[in-house]
Amino acid sequence: MCFRSIMPPAMADTLDIWAVDSQIASDGSISVDFLLPTGIYIQLEVPREATISYIKQMLWKQVHNYPMFNLLMDIDSYMFACVNQTAVYEELEDETRRLCDVRPFLPVLKLVTRSCDPAEKLDSKIGVLIGKGLHEFDALKDPEVNEFRRKMRKFSEDKIQSLVGLSWIDWLKHTYPPEHEPSVLENLEDKLYGGKLVVAVHFENSQDVFSFQVSPNLNPIKINELAIQKRLTIRGKEEEASPCDYVLQVSGRVEYVFGDHPLIQFQYIRNCVMNRTLPHFILVECCKIKKMYEQEMIAIEAAINRNSSSLPLPLPPKKTRVISHVWGNNNPFQIVLVKGNKLNTEETVKVHVRAGLFHGTELLCKTVVSSEISGKNDHIWNEQLEFDINICDLPRMARLCFAVYAVLDKVKTKKSTKTINPSKYQTIRKAGKVHYPVAWVNTMVFDFKGQLRSGDVILHSWSSFPDELEEMLNPMGTVQTNPYAENATALHIKFPENKKQPYYYPPFDKIIEKAAEIASGDSANVSSRGGKKFLAVLKEILDRDPLSQLCENEMDLIWTLRQDCRENFPQSLPKLLLSIKWNKLEDVAQLQALLQIWPKLPPREALELLDFNYPDQYVREYAVGCLRQMSDEELSQYLLQLVQVLKYEPFLDCALSRFLLERALDNRRIGQFLFWHLRSEVHTPAVSIQFGVILEAYCRGSVGHMKVLSKQVEALNKLKTLNSLIKLNAMKLNRAKGKEAMHTCLKQSAYREALSDLQSPLNPCVILSELYVEKCRYMDSKMKPLWLVYSNRAFGEDAVGVIFKNGDDLRQDMLTLQMLRLMDLLWKEAGLDLRMLPYGCLATGDRSGLIEVVSTSETIADIQLNSSNVAATAAFNKDALLNWLKEYNSGDDLDRAIEEFTLSCAGYCVASYVLGIGDRHSDNIMVKKTGQLFHIDFGHILGNFKSKFGIKRERVPFILTYDFIHVIQQGKTGNTEKFGRFRQCCEDAYLILRRHGNLFITLFALMLTAGLPELTSVKDIQYLKDSLALGKSEEEALKQFKQKFDEALRESWTTKVNWMAHTVRKDYRS
């Protein structure tokens, strides 16, 4: 019987049935329809929280009373199946799951014979985990998708196979990789105890804690030895134990310290030293680790058997045929614009199509414009569009970009734009007419195999236009067509038919052959070197920032002196690539040959080559080759950008996607963040397929990680449901009742199980053990974020706080916090530790995600309010902050807290100025009890400051109020020495960042495709160039910063007025 045919009609109510407020009703039951193999239909009331096993037993007691019971087999021969929330047919093999966690799309369960196909079970689990059914990929019947999935399955299986031979210690390095920081900071020595490191160790299942003073350069195994000796001294001789029988585990975390690195290079120990806390370890017996290893090996071997049984049959060998290369075709490139459908314009409105050929943002030839026609539904052109470029000169990554425009007379504009929103998109005025963009779409000229496209193609277009257009086109847009074809404008075009044989772009060996042929025939090209005078000019051009435009003469000079560039300025490669004529096959061939002998760039410099401006396949392969030099820690630092630039890749199979998969499968920490960066955007139509198939490949290659990730996905689904409940009841219940309802929900066994004992998505080392329900609450803001507190079962460990947000886009916060982490890293590399606190933040879905709670901290607003009886004067109490620090610190601790405050305040002053962080009020600046100041909530960056009635609320470049200065000066008005040191810290920090200005510009440029509201075009990044004064000398830049510093100090009274208004408003609301 077909499952689809007997499904009852869909409910009219679109609200998620698992999120309605009946979930917290006393009975907590739901009516479920059961479909038996005999065709019998039974309806039962079952508890929402019941396990699948319990529900099956309930059903079995009832089936005795129905006809044809004798035709059924034993109960264990059956399992339930349903259609889940991602529209995937799912067989519920794991019967310990609860119904409310399975979350069927409708409350319908079908009893089916237990499946024996392990490959189907794995496919089903992967589909649920990634939030996209694998059947969707199959249904596309897309050769490129199928080819990529086949290759990636083989790639993943090879990775799994390589794990089988690993020793348990190598498996531990792969699964729980230690985090190292190779460089040693000078100021670390000041925080040691007489040059010694103090560590605490206790054996598992023992309360005895041993402390040692050791050299920071000892290896971890030495700590094992000292602990064993100490236990022998105290307890006497027990069973013989070797240091190699134990591994050091960080107390309260899934983090292990082992290997040959000195203790001080482990990130956990370094953080403890910097924060003046005691590193605490548990000595775990190796046999426990080995048991974990053996369990995973069983899962891996089962996965190998599953995969090998489901490998597709190899394709039959194709008949050899003559292949023609496009370099032999000197005909002009042309297409036929056949027609357009669903243009959504009035019948009298004329429409035309603009088409252009691009390589990155470079226009390869003049754009072509069709004739203007009008029509009701279909607009038929049947018009040939010829481009001023020969087929032989088309680069491999050329893309054909289209835009549909409605053309109106200026006089008629007001009457004729019922279906066009002129305020939403930019308009172009030409020859007394107004051109309104209606739709755009892009497609590649060559397919994924390098074959020149031919025949009819229907392109379903997109209607949302970016802020900036190149030649009235959108070349930076996706080359994927709109999957919502039913309502999208469609363009029907026709590429030339290649009747004899298809044309391909030449393979690499032919390209190199061509370059050699050109070089041998033109001796002038071989030299391409200049004298000292030209080198000086060249250096000046190459030293400019990435946003600087090159004029035609400068590009010609760079290309002519390309050998000088390679030998003397290898970092000039991006500018050389912008100087080449990509519409000239001879230049392209010579570049590819030159690229083979170009020195490897440092990874940070190579990142720029992954920008949209550099689409060439071999250039991107070169860039990825440079990135291979990155350590895992460095790769993690830039993972956010590397995932975003996948969107610039026109084809699924590329060097970058393979590189990311390879490193993720080698290091589970990288794997977890790659998983969430991809999964959080898998709902986006333009990248749904691309990100989905990469996620599938990761899951197939990391079956041992799937269980951990599934637990995280389940927990986040529960939090989303709870958040929906709170929003629904927010208007009905007062705050106390709402909090009580939340606690009732969290105490339910389904919630308790789903939200306990999971690795934090924010940090896989942190275990979220058990909810401290009474401390959990929801916050007052519009989206009602959930404030969750976890008690830590580990010896002497603090509680862990997490905020779940649903309805807010956290990606801009993620980017800003990443930049703060990078600044912290660059400062430390230069020997300056400004005690930055870039807390964890992770987008996990469509406008949802998690934020780390920084313990023992309060907002400036709360500190000021608690010290004053009148809200209006609270912001002007300069003693409040210093008194608050004195409340928690005294003596040397107070001096240390003021030092922490001074350094962190300097760091955030410089960071907020450079990044243009806006909306800085007293509720989004916080201070820890230990003195560290830090900023939260980054909704406005790059100089997008809030304004009211056209007047900017924030008039200062960064926040530096007199109560901050009061703390820095230790409460002494004339303490100019302390303030002078603070100012010097700010200036040093600014100059360090400025020296890495190109890196910041590159990283923001790589994020242009993310769709962040305040980062949509190159114009937005211009703010960074201005704030870092990249066009000026270091002396001029420092002078500019000093002026900004004085301005922040001089105008700080305006900040206080803003804070007063904010505090009064906050006090009134509460």
Curated annotation (Swiss-Prot):
> Quaternary state and partners of this protein?
Heterodimer of a catalytic subunit PIK3CB and a p85 regulatory subunit (PIK3R1, PIK3R2 or PIK3R3). Interaction with PIK3R2 is required for nuclear localization and nuclear export. Part of a complex with PIK3R1 and PTEN. Binding to PTEN may antagonize the lipid kinase activity under normal growth conditions. Part of a complex involved in autophagosome formation composed of PIK3C3 and PIK3R4. Interacts with BECN1, ATG14 and RAB5A.
Specify whether Cytoplasm is a keyword of the entry: yes
Q: Which Gene3D superfamilies match?
A: 3.10.20.770, C2 domain, Phosphatidylinositol 3-/4-kinase, catalytic domain, Phosphatidylinositol 3-kinase Catalytic Subunit, Chain A, domain 4, Phosphatidylinositol 3-kinase, accessory domain (PIK)
Instruction: Specify where the region named G-loop lies, as residue ranges.
Output: 778-784
Q: Which CDD domains match?
A: C2_PI3K_class_I_beta_delta, PI3Ka_I, PI3Kc_IA_beta
Gene name for this UniProt entry: Pik3cb
Name of this protein: Phosphatidylinositol 4,5-bisphosphate 3-kinase catalytic subunit beta isoform
Where is the motif named Nuclear localization signal (NLS) mapped on this chain? 410-418
Cell compartment(s), UniProt: Cytoplasm; Nucleus
* Metabolic or biological pathway: Phospholipid metabolism; phosphatidylinositol phosphate biosynthesis
Q: Which family does it belong to?
A: Belongs to the PI3/PI4-kinase family.
One Gene Ontology BP term is:
negative regulation of vascular endothelial growth factor signaling pathway
Q: Which PANTHER family match?
A: PHOSPHATIDYLINOSITOL 4,5-BISPHOSPHATE 3-KINASE CATALYTIC SUBUNIT BETA ISOFORM (PTHR10048:SF33), PHOSPHATIDYLINOSITOL KINASE (PTHR10048)
Q: Which SUPFAM superfamilies does the annotation name?
A: ARM repeat (SSF48371), C2 domain (Calcium/lipid-binding domain, CaLB) (SSF49562), Protein kinase-like (PK-like) (SSF56112), Ubiquitin-like (SSF54236)
Q: What is known of its domains?
A: The inhibitory interactions with PIK3R1 are mediated by the PI3K-ABD domain and the C2 PI3K-type domain with the iSH2 (inter-SH2) region of PIK3R1; the C2 PI3K-type domain, the PI3K helical domain, and the PI3K/PI4K kinase domain with the nSH2 (N-terminal SH2) region of PIK3R1; and the PI3K/PI4K kinase domain with the cSH2 (C-terminal SH2) region of PIK3R1. The inhibitory interaction between the PI3K-ABD domain and the C2 PI3K-type domain with the iSH2 (inter-SH2) region of PIK3R1 is weak. The nuclear localization signal (NLS) is required for its function in cell survival.
Domain of life of the source? Eukaryota
What Pfam families is this protein classified in?
PI3_PI4_kinase, PI3K_C2, PI3K_p85B, PI3K_rbd, PI3Ka
Which positions fall inside the PI3K-RBD domain?
A: 194-285
Which segments constitute the C2 PI3K-type domain? 327-496
What is the native source organism of this protein?
A: Rattus norvegicus
Query: Disulphide bridges in this chain?
Result: none
First-level EC class? transferase
Ranges for domain PI3K-ABD come to 26-115
Q: Where is this region: Activation loop?
A: 935-961
Q: Name one GO molecular function term.
A: 1-phosphatidylinositol-4,5-bisphosphate 3-kinase activity
Q: What is its main location?
A: cytoplasm
